[in-house]
Every structure is written in C-alpha cells, then in structure tokens.
C-alpha cells in the first residue's frame, strides 16, 4: 500500500491535492513551496532525500515549461529536473502533466513507472 506521497512544485492545484491526500490519511511531503505562500495546515519539507523516498511523487501540470526545471513558482530556487530524477525512489510511481519526451525517456531508462495526467481522456481538453 502506498503511504508516503510527495507533492513537488506546481501551483495552488498542487496544494489542494496535498490537502486532500493528507485528509485521507496519507503522509504528505510538500516540496517547492517555500516562497510567498500560506500553507495553512501543511508544512514544506526541506529534506530533498526524504521527499524523493516517497512511494508516490506528484509533479505539476505542466511538469516543466523549459525542459530543464520543474514548474515551481513558489520555490525559492529553481528545481532542476535532473537533480530530482537521479534520486527518485526506483519503486515510486510518478505522476505529472504534459511530461516531455526527454523526461519520459529518462524515467523509462531508470525503470521508474509514471503516468501523465493529460494522457487520460477525461482530463485532456
């Protein structure tokens, strides 16, 4: 059973997901929300290793705008995709939206399972 979920980067939709998961009893690690935002009942985790050890990693929609950094408007520092990719728990399931082909290939090369939200018919427009 998946128990630990990391929500990394993104906008207010990601915070809503984190709150809903926490309310369902999941242990939620929130990362990349350390600038100019009120977290209310959530806490932002600063230990990247702990965040990347989660069973599930939830990335934003879109995962990236530039192909190099995670979409993270509330992070103090840019979050470089390659810095995260090499440290993700290999048995984790990664979710994200509009995952670019180079990131998909890197996940596949590292044998990391992933799902793109926008590949689901009910979520794409």
Describe the predicted segments one by one:
Residues 5-16, 21, 125:
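Glycine-rich adenosine-cofactor-binding loop
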Residues 58-124:
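Glycine/serine-rich phosphate-binding loop and adjoining beta1-alpha1 elements at the start
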Residues 2-4, 91:
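Phosphate-coordination loops involved in phosphoryl transfer and adenosine-cofactor binding
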Residues 40-53:
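Short acidic low-complexity segments
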Residues 24-40:
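NAD(P)-binding Rossmann-fold cofactor-contacting core
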Residues 5, 28-31, 114:
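Hydrophobic anchor at the start of a short beta-strand
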Residues 11, 34, 98-100:
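Residues in the short beta-alpha loop(s) of Rossmann-like NAD(P)-binding domains
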């Amino acid at each position: 059973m998946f128990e630990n979920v990391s929500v990394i980067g993104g906008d207010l939709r990601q915070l809503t997901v984190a709150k809903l998961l926490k309310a369902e009893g999941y242990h939620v690690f929130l990362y990349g929300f350390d600038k100019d935002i009120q977290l209310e009942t959530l806490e932002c985790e600063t230990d990247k290793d702990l965040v990347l050890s989660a069973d599930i990693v939830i990335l934003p929609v879109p995962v990236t705008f530039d192909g190099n950094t995670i979409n993270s408007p509330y992070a103090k520092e840019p979050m470089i995709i390659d810095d995260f990719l090499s440290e993700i728990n290999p048995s984790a399931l990664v979710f994200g939206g509009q995952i670019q082909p180079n990131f998909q290939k890197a996940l596949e090369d590292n044998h990391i399972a992933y799902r793109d939200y926008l590949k689901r018919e009910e979520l794409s427009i």
